[in-house]
């Protein structure tokens, strides 16, 4: 009995001695990690000029060599109620939570998949039909091949699906109309392919809606519960959630988005469309109406510090502190460039050619990867310079420039701040 106890203690000590302890973020001055502070702080005036010109808000955080060297907020979390400018707008702070839009794809769906791949619970070469029953071609489909689609095809955005079927808008979706999650899965199965799988890359929300359903099939848990309990909670993240208003957060903690719901200032209409200023609800139509606020392609809210931790996980090769989610081989697998298009990894966008300059600028390394979000969010992770940048914004919280010409262009979207690459270059240009 005594021998068993001693052996157990020795084994425990031995395992703990070899346990991986990953770097955690600490704060440092820019000069301590190779920045010219004066150059870096020139951003302050430029961003403030953009706020004065009408850009709603920008939250910026910069990581270098495991240190947070810049974290600041500019502008307003909420400045409009409908078309009316508030007499007392709510200032954005470094704790303000933002609708991540398509960055959800990376920091919910991809993180979940990377974890499941590392644990051996899924292989990217598995067929989609292994996890979604009856995922196959429909009678009358002109382009065939759904039953042969693999998860890697979905991740590479080469599966053949359209970019945006607009399931909740009956006027556009037609027979594919859906405003309930269970129906949406059936409509996705019925969605016809638009091109022969593997013939080209078309960035598609449908791809990540499918991946969200696959994660739920494997884990037997809703996507939000899985990522919140197995990823965010172990990492100590307290402001990264789906449906924040249902989970203890209040509107003043969150940046508002579109002024008149999803109507683009009154030119778009469909059943149950929201018309009030969106504040604490996901902006994305498919995520809100068709998926109940939780989807693999959109719906996640977070702040810059929580996203910084997740970016540091990637820089660390899969862990943070004493938490290991996956390993460096998994990171390499998911961020490796697609042979067909160097700007795509497995979900991640990669700085593979000049077409990514508006996103990553001209100074980031070619190995840089990350993603953008329609609401005004960017994440950029540079393993060569051991550096990461997160920009969170609420770009749609401004009037539509010309609703009848293009309802998807907001006044703020015409400002230079809407081009992330310029900000990224100013940060890199501040390195000594």
UniProtKB/Swiss-Prot annotation:
Residues passing through the membrane, by range: 7-25
Top EC class for this record: hydrolase
Domain of life: Bacteria
BP GO terms, sorted: proteolysis
GO cellular component: plasma membrane
E.C. number: 3.4.16.4
Subcellular localization(s) per the UniProt record: Cell inner membrane
InterPro entries attached to this UniProt entry: Beta-lactam-related (IPR001466), Beta-lactam/transpept-like (IPR012338), Diverse_Enzym_Activities (IPR050789), Pept_S12_YfeW/YbbE-like (IPR022849)
Name of the protein: Putative D-alanyl-D-alanine carboxypeptidase
């Amino acid at each position: 009995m005594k021998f068993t106890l001693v052996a157990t203690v020795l084994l425990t000590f031995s395992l703990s001695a070899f346990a991986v302890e990953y770097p955690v973020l600490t704060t440092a001055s820019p000069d301590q990690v190779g920045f010219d502070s004066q150059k870096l702080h020139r951003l302050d005036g430029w961003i403030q000029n953009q706020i004065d010109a009408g850009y709603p808000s920008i939250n910026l955080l910069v990581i270098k060599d495991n240190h947070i060297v810049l974290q600041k907020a500019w502008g307003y979390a909420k400045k409009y109620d409908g078309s009316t400018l508030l007499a007392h707008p709510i200032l954005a702070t470094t704790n303000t939570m933002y609708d991540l839009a398509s960055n959800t794809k990376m920091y919910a769906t991809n993180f979940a998949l990377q974890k499941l791949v590392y644990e051996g619970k899924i292989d990217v070469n598995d067929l989609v039909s292994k996890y979604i029953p009856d995922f196959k071609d429909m009678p009358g489909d002109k382009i065939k091949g759904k039953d042969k689609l693999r998860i890697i095809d979905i991740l590479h955005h080469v599966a053949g699906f359209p970019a945006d079927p607009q399931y909740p808008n009956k006027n556009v979706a037609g027979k594919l109309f859906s405003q309930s999650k269970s129906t949406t899965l059936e409509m996705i199965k019925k969605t016809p392919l638009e091109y022969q799988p593997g013939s080209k890359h078309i960035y598609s929300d449908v791809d990540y809606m499918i991946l969200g359903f696959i994660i739920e099939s494997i884990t037997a848990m809703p996507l939000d519960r899985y990522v919140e309990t197995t990823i965010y909670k172990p990492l100590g993240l307290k402001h990264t959630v789906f449906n924040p208003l249902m989970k203890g957060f209040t509107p003043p903690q969150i940046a508002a988005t579109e002024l008149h719901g999803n109507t683009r200032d009154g030119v778009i209409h469909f059943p149950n469309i929201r018309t009030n200023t969106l504040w604490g609800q996901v902006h994305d139509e498919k995520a809100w109406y068709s998926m109940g606020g939780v989807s693999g392609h959109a719906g996640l809210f977070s702040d810059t510090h929580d996203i910084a931790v997740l970016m540091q996980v990637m820089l660390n090769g899969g862990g943070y502190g004493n938490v290991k989610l996956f390993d460096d081989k998994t990171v390499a697998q998911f961020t490796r460039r697609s042979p067909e298009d160097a700007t795509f990894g497995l979900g991640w966008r990669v700085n593979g050619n000049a077409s990514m300059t508006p996103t990553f600028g001209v100074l980031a390394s070619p190995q840089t990867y990350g993603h953008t979000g329609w609401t005004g969010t960017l994440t950029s992770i540079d393993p060569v310079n051991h550096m990461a940048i997160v920009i969170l914004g609420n770009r749609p919280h401004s009037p539509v420039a010309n609703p009848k010409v293009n309802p998807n262009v907001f006044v703020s979207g015409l400002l230079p701040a809407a081009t992330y690459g310029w900000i990224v270059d100013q940060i890199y240009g501040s390195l000594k």
